[in-house]
Amino acid sequence: MGQGRVGAGMAELAIGNNLQIYRHGTMTSFQYFIVSRMQPLMMAGISTYCLLDRSLEEALDRLSDITSLIEVVDEGPHFISDASIFSNYSGKFILHAPYHGVNIASSFEAIREASVKVMTDCFSVAVEIGADVVIHPGYYAWEQERERANQQFRASLQELRDAAAERSVTFYFENMGDMNFFNLRTPADLDIIDGTGFALDVGHANLNGCLPAFLETTFGHMHIHDNDGKRDTHSPVGEGSIDFVPVLAALQRTGATSVIEVKTFAGVQESIRALGRIGVAF
């Protein structure tokens, strides 16, 4: 049972103890030992990213029948203009702050300041619904601007920390894909966030060839999707090259929240089935 309307029960993600076969092949005895020892009731959820062609209300209605944790992509058709929409639902929400048209590392101070304002506005909504927030770490347009962009990011980081502290909001920076101008692409880049919360995007890490190293870090949230290691397709689990057995082991180790973040609702359903084949059930 999903979170549903107010009064409905809560659903959680369970790791089974009778795993035998994984889609990418037979699990090694070590993989079997790790996953079979995972504790049950590990919570997972779904991002509204799969339903961006629908209204936010319709997306919440459909996803709340499946899960008790929903990450809302707070832009486009799912931009939250009024937090009262969430009063019709129980369960837990996470907000993915707007990312198109904003850059908290912009060399242009006016753009940086406006981008921070967009983030803090998202924090204000998060306070109303008790949600954590995921943020993109910004980018630079030219290699010659990289140091300036780092300085701008550090200024934004301090302002965001102050705003989050004032509102008692937890936020995470997400690792980016394989385009060179993005901040935070590899574990070596984690220093830039200076101990602030980290959201591990599994697909993005795979694109940069550093997923195993990222799985050894500390993170508080995770985006689950698959790809072939070349394109950021946000494909259903099992359609790409990612081995999700160690991913689930890292989730168990950290106790992080996680959401499926694929492009289509059918992809969500396929991902649930694929995760079920390695002992995960909603």
Provide a role label for each language-model segment.
Residues 60-65, 79-97, 121-129, 161-166, ...:
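Acidic (Asp/Glu)-rich catalytic clusters
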Residues 69, 94, 172-173, 199, ...:
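Generic enzyme active-site microenvironment
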Residues 24, 30-45, 58-61, 132, ...:
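Histidine-acidic metal/acid-base catalytic patches
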Residues 50-57, 69-84, 103-105, 109-110, ...:
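Acidic-and-aromatic substrate-binding clefts and catalytic sites of carbohydrate-active enzymes
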Residues 33, 37, 105-197, 253:
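Active-site acidic/histidine proton-transfer and metal-coordination neighborhood
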Residues 1-3, 10, 19:
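Ser/Thr/Pro/Gly-rich low-complexity, intrinsically disordered segments
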Residues 15-17, 21-121, 282:
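N-terminal pre-domain/capping segments
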Residues 96-100, 132-140, 225-227:
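Short loop/turn segments at strand-loop or loop-helix junctions that form parts
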